[in-house]
Amino acid sequence: MSRKESRVQAFQTLFQLEMKDSDLTINEAISFIKDGNPDLDFEFIHWLVSGVKDHEPVLDETISPYLKDWTIARLLKTDRIILRMATYEILHSDTPAKVVMNEAVELTKQFSDDDHYKFINGVLSNIKK
């Protein structure tokens, strides 16, 4: 299955892990999506989810200067997760930043409010510079 689908599953896993009362481990959260999705790139999903969780403070520090009158805590949970995922992938993979940004915009269109993709694109454009 495509990286695009794997990013969707990574997003959903991170969203699940962000729930207030979640005591799931990363491996437990990923195991829920393994059933019925044998074609996903679970190595990539684990890399992305673990990387975001392990580097969350650094990612937030990287993102924060570009939020313009916002704080990371005030962002919608969906936007915060998408920004963290894309920033981690831009900084720690060989995937072209343009591809990562386009995927982040598509995730935002799918999971966030109507025009938030513009905000996500703007923040990521500044990060990739």
From Swiss-Prot:
SUPFAM superfamilies: NusB-like (SSF48013). Keywords: RNA-binding, Transcription, Transcription antitermination, Transcription regulation. Involved in transcription antitermination. Required for transcription of ribosomal RNA (rRNA) genes. Binds specifically to the boxA antiterminator sequence of the ribosomal RNA (rrn) operons. PANTHER family: ANTITERMINATION NUSB DOMAIN-CONTAINING PROTEIN (PTHR11078:SF3), N UTILIZATION SUBSTANCE PROTEIN B-RELATED (PTHR11078). This is Transcription antitermination protein NusB. It holds the Pfam family NusB. GO terms for molecular function: RNA binding. NCBIfam families: nusB. Belongs to the NusB family. InterPro entries: NusB-like_sf, NusB_fam, NusB_RsmB_TIM44. The keyword Flavoprotein does not apply. One of its GO terms (cellular component) is cytosol. HAMAP family: NusB. GO terms for biological process: DNA-templated transcription termination; transcription antitermination. It comes from Staphylococcus aureus (strain bovine RF122 / ET3-1).
